[in-house]
């Protein structure tokens, strides 16, 4: 997007640089309504996955939009009809992160990219909704216990 009229608007444009936290509440770059008119605006709650970036050598950035936003071409978006299923998919993908990085990322001469057809064919177990809720609650409890530790200097030793 080399047109200067496309930039400095108020519409978030998420890139892999923004995918550092589980929920995206803003982006470094914003585009104009003119630029957004030719792009899809994804609603809050959409899952985003980095599909092409050097970061895929070691991490699989996966986030949930906390705002309506556009995305760049290096990101894949998953809009699910059920917010609870979206949360389950988030944790399901994170659980398979080591496998995905090892088996489903290809290195080419310029940048790593996700073998998206193979990723899309990957099966993630989906238990009954009541079991999903129980597992997600347990994960959140564990994450809440770990959060204070991450700011403790002894934790990073």
Give the ranges of each region predicted by the language model.
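Sequence-specific dsDNA recognition surfaces
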Residues: 1-3, 15-44
């Amino acid at each position: 997007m080399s047109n200067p009229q496309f930039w400095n608007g108020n519409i978030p444009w998420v890139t892999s640089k923004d995918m550092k936290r589980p929920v995206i509440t803003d982006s470094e770059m914003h585009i104009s309504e003119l630029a957004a008119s030719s792009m899809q605006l994804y609603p809050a709650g959409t899952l985003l996955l980095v599909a092409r970036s050097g970061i895929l050598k070691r991490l699989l950035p996966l986030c949930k939009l906390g705002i309506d936003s556009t995305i760049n071409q290096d990101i894949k978006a998953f809009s699910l009809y059920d917010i609870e299923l979206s949360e389950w998919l988030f944790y399901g993908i994170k659980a398979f992160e080591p496998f995905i990085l090892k088996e489903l990322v290809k290195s080419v001469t310029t940048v790593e990219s996700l073998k998206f057809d193979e990723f899309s064919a990957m099966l993630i177990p989906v238990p009954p909704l009541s079991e999903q809720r129980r597992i997600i609650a347990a994960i959140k409890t564990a994450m809440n216990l770990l959060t204070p530790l991450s700011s403790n200097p002894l934790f990073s030793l």
